[in-house]
Design a protein with these regions (language model features):
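Short alpha-helical transmembrane segments in multi-pass integral membrane proteins
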Residues: 1-14, 71-137, 168-172, 177-233, ...
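Transmembrane helical elements of multi-pass membrane transporters/channels
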Residues: 12-31, 131, 135, 142, ...
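Helix-terminus/linker motif at the lipid-water interface of multi-pass membrane proteins
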Residues: 22, 26-44, 112-119, 175-182, ...
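Alpha-helical transmembrane segments of multipass membrane proteins
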Residues: 29, 33, 110, 144-148, ...
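Small-residue hotspots at the loop-to-helix junctions and early N-terminal turns
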Residues: 40-51, 126-129, 188, 258-273, ...
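Small-residue-rich hydrophobic transmembrane alpha-helices
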Residues: 43-106, 139-158, 263-327, 359-380
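Small-residue-enriched core segments of transmembrane alpha-helices in multipass membrane transport
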Residues: 162-169, 269-272, 349, 382-391
Length: 437
C-alpha cells in the first residue's frame, strides 16, 4: 500500500473515532457549562474534582489499553479467535482494576484540607467526587469494548453510543443540577448514568462481530490477562503521569484563587476538545501500526506512524490559529464570570502554543502502543512533565508571580519535551524489525 492509500485507511478509521472522542469531550463541556452557572466555587470544585477523577480512573484506562496492541496485532495476523478472547480478558481487567480505584476515589476528598483549597471549593470537590466515583466501572468497561471494536475496524457503534451518552448526559445534568437542585453532585450522577448507558449500547455491536465459534472465549485466561497487565501497567503509569500533572496544576491554580482554578477548567476543557482529534488519529495510528506488525511488515508500521504524525500536525496547527484569534469568544461560551474570563483568555493563548506538541506526543504514543512498547511513553511523560514541566510551572507561577499563566507555560514546555522523546523513540524502534507481543 502506498502513502496515499495508507492515509485514506487511517483517516477512514480515525474519522468515527474522532467523533467518538469529541462526543465524550462534549460531555465534559456540557458539565462545565451547566455547573459554570452555579458560580466560581462550583466551577472550581468541578475543576479539581475532574482532575482527581481522571487521575485515578486513567490509571485503569492505561491498564485496559494494554489490550490494544495484542488485539490489533492478532487481527493483523488473521487470529480472530485470539482477538475475541483478549476482549473478554480485557473486560475482566477493567472490572478488577476499577474496584480499588473506586475506593481511592471515595477516600480522596479526605486529603483536601492539606491541599490548601478554600472551604467552599473543598465542599464542592467532595460532593462532585463522591457522586462520580462509581463512573470508573462503566468508563473502563466501555474503553475495553471500544478497543476491540476499533481494532476490528467497526467504529459506527462507538459514535452512536457516544451521541446517545451525550444527549443523556445533557438531560441528566439539567434534571439533577437544576430540577432536583443537587448542584455539582447532580453533574457527577448524570455522568455515571450516561457512561452506563454507553456500555449497554455497545453490547449488541460486540455480539455482532464476525468471529469463529469459540466456547472458551469467556473463560479466564491467565496468560492473556498477564499480557494485558504487562503492557497495561506502564500505560497506566504514563496516563497518570500525564493527567496527574494537569490535575496538579489545577490544584495549584486553586491555591492562587477560585477564579484561577475555574479558568484552568475552562481552558483545559477547550484544549482537550482539540486534543480529541489527535486522540482519534493516535488511536487509528495504533491500530494501523499493530495491523502491520501482526502481518510482519515493519516498514508499513513505520509509514503508518509517520502519516499519523503528519495528520496530527496539520490539524493542530489549524487549532492553534483558532485559539489565538478566538480566545475571548471560546472562553465566554463556558462561563460568564468576568474574573474567570480575565484569566482564561491568556491561558488559551498559551494553549495555542502547545497545540502542536500536544498533538504530536499523543499520536507518537499511539504509534508506540501499536508497536507494543509501553515503557517509552511512561519514561517520557515522567521526565517531560515531572522533571522539566512542573518545576518550571511552579517557578513561573509562584516565584515569578505569573500566576496561572506561568503554570501553563510550564505545561507547554513539558509537552514539548514529551513529544520530542516519543517521536525519537518511534523513529529508532521502527528502523528495525518489531516483534509481536
Amino acid at each position: 500500500m502506498d502513502d496515499a492509500g495508507e492515509l485514506r485507511v487511517l483517516l477512514r478509521l480515525a474519522g468515527p473515532l474522532i467523533l467518538g472522542y469529541a462526543g465524550s469531550q462534549l460531555m465534559s463541556m456540557t458539565d462545565t457549562a451547566m455547573v459554570g452557572r452555579l458560580g466560581a466555587d462550583a466551577l472550581a470544585g468541578v475543576s479539581v474534582g475532574n482532575g482527581v477523577y481522571f487521575t485515578v480512573s486513567c490509571f485503569g484506562l492505561g491498564c485496559v489499553a494494554g489490550m490494544e496492541a495484542p488485539i490489533a496485532q492478532a487481527l493483523g495476523a488473521g487470529e480472530r479467535v485470539r482477538a475475541r478472547r483478549l476482549l473478554w480478558q480485557g473486560v475482566r481487567v477493567a472490572l478488577g482494576v476499577s474496584l480499588p480505584l473506586v475506593v481511592i476515589m471515595a477516600l480522596s476528598p479526605l486529603v483536601l484540607p492539606w491541599a490548601g483549597l478554600g472551604a467552599a471549593t473543598s465542599r464542592e470537590v467532595g460532593a462532585y467526587t463522591w457522586a462520580r466515583m462509581l463512573n470508573v466501572v462503566p468508563f473502563l468497561v466501555y474503553n475495553a469494548q471500544r478497543s476491540y471494536l476499533q481494532a476490528s475496524g467497526i467504529t459506527r457503534p462507538i459514535v452512536i453510543s457516544t451521541v446517545a451518552g451525550l444527549i443523556g448526559n445533557a438531560i441528566g445534568n439539567y434534571f439533577f443540577i437544576y430540577t432536583l437542585r443537587l448542584g455539582v453532585a447532580g453533574s457527577g450522577i448524570a455522568s455515571t448514568l450516561a457512561s452506563t448507558a454507553m456500555v449497554l449500547a455497545l453490547a449488541p455491536a460486540i455480539a455482532a462481530v464476525d468471529a469463529p465459534p469459540d466456547p472458551e472465549r469467556r473463560r479466564f485466561d491467565r496468560a492473556l490477562v498477564r499480557t494485558i497487565l504487562r503492557l497495561g501497567h506502564p500505560n497506566g503509569g504514563q496516563v497518570v503521569a500525564e493527567v496527574g500533572v494537569f490535575a496538579t496544576v489545577g490544584v495549584l491554580a486553586g491555591r492562587i484563587g477560585a477564579a484561577s482554578a475555574a479558568a484552568h477548567l475552562v481552558a483545559i476543557t477547550l484544549a482537550s476538545f482539540t486534543f480529541c482529534v489527535t486522540l482519534g488519529i493516535g488511536a487509528a495510528t495504533s491500530v494501523r501500526v499493530g495491523h502491520h506488525i501482526g502481518a510482519g511488515a515493519t516498514d508499513g508500521a513505520r509509514r503508518a506512524g509517520l502519516i499519523g504524525l503528519g495528520s496530527s500536525s496539520v490539524f493542530m496547527l489549524a487549532a492553534a490559529l483558532v485559539f489565538f484569534t478566538c480566545a475571548p469568544w471560546l472562553a465566554a461560551a463556558l462561563t460568564n464570570d468576568a474574573s474567570v474570563l480575565a484569566v482564561a483568555i491568556p491561558l488559551l493563548h498559551v494553549a495555542a502554543i502547545f497545540q502542536l506538541s500536544d498533538g504530536l506526543q499523543a499520536t507518537a504514543a499511539g504509534a508506540l502502543r501499536g508497536a507494543g512498547d509501553p515503557h517509552a511513553p511512561l519514561y517520557a511523560n515522567l521526565v517531560g512533565h515531572w522533571v522539566i514541566g512542573l518545576p518550571v510551572a511552579v517557578a513561573l507561577g509562584f516565584f515569578a508571580h505569573q500566576g496561572a499563566v506561568g503554570l501553563w507555560w510550564g505545561l507547554s514546555l513539558g509537552l514539548t519535551a514529551v513529544a520530542v522523546g516519543l517521536i525519537g523513540r518511534f523513529l529508532w524502534l521502527s528502523a528495525r524489525p518489531i516483534r509481536r507481543v
